[in-house]
């Protein structure tokens, strides 16, 4: 299978690049700079893309790459930091300037296949302070920005662009990728996530030679698809375990068990609510909550494994963003720990299987549809592994848990009524320690402040707050304050990711 190698220089944009390439129908694989030359040398790799990154090419310890990457006679496209790395490595000059941030107009100077379908001037997205002052010998400048910076350059099959074609703010970014992949790299293969089902099933079957596979299910699309793929591969050797930690959305445990049973997968239900909730009581720190939930989950899982002596494998629904947000990709900053990533406790002694590790959420949904799963599962909003605990800011209490659960149900119900639920990435409520004076039943009342968070995204790597009509927000607010006596104020979160994260904790 023909593929593109995306070299990750530490920025989370590397995954956005990979997604955009896959959207064009070409498989993209991410590699660290240290392994780039070896991986790029493989015959199936038809092109290399050097990602952006948070560093300066002149900083001590900044990500670097072997110049051999340019001697492979394969098309190379450097983006932002990758563009500057090309200049530095091949004899150009990189300087620090005022930079460009946000929407910028670039002017195309030369007709080039990379810009087929572009107008003479197009809007792009810039995010840089360093810039290429002089291109390397033999390079031609293809485009400049409205501020006079080199926006694109080329020598033979080596291209560099200062802007970010992978973000939607670059209006013709997808067209550029199509040009680079199909016209310059001449890649003809067409890759689709739903076409990978047979391969995934065969890979699982080849790995699970003997023994059973245990998989934790939650009702979400990731764990459900994982369980179904396992079932297709090894049948009744799949042992699905639903651990009820008491932190799920309303009705979720029952729905999850019912669905899997209808497919033919037996589900072992473990009621561990008290075990989790007692340990969380009063805990305020976000990472401490995640640690407690992760460790308790592992303990409960371990107890389950002990009751299944033939279990030799543990399957998880880990996705690409899970990996990058946990800092598992070299050069990426750790944002928050993820309960699915970071290794297994030593007492598990199980081999880990992650059938979805190479996919993004939208690709998993496409696989789910191809597997024939119900639309309620396919389009279920992402839900954090630690559950509603990370939507409680400050000390954890059962009172706050009940508030968040009820408020989230109201948010989801109103969005469904308005036909907006599937149009947003996530929608939920959070609660903290702050309180607000209110009036209920003609009497003064002191109640909690609930914050509603609704975001739009494609992959959770970046997200924008959703411009929900005011009348919908008004209904949500009215219902929350009317139906949850402990709440006197509802606010709406209007910060995007970055600088914020989607979840509050």
From Swiss-Prot:
Residues 191-380 form the GMPS ATP-PPase domain. Residues 3-190 form the Glutamine amidotransferase type-1 domain. Pathway: Purine metabolism; GMP biosynthesis; GMP from XMP (L-Gln route): step 1/1. It is an enzyme of class 6 (ligase). SUPFAM superfamilies: Adenine nucleotide alpha hydrolases-like (SSF52402), Class I glutamine amidotransferase-like (SSF52317). The gene is guaA. The active site is at residues 80, 164, 166. One of its GO terms (molecular function) is ATP binding. GO terms for cellular component: cytosol. It catalyses: XMP + L-glutamine + ATP + H2O = GMP + L-glutamate + AMP + diphosphate + 2 H(+). This is GMP synthase [glutamine-hydrolyzing]. It comes from Pyrobaculum aerophilum (strain ATCC 51768 / DSM 7523 / JCM 9630 / CIP 104966 / NBRC 100827 / IM2). Gene3D superfamilies: 3.30.300.10, 3.40.50.880, HUPs.
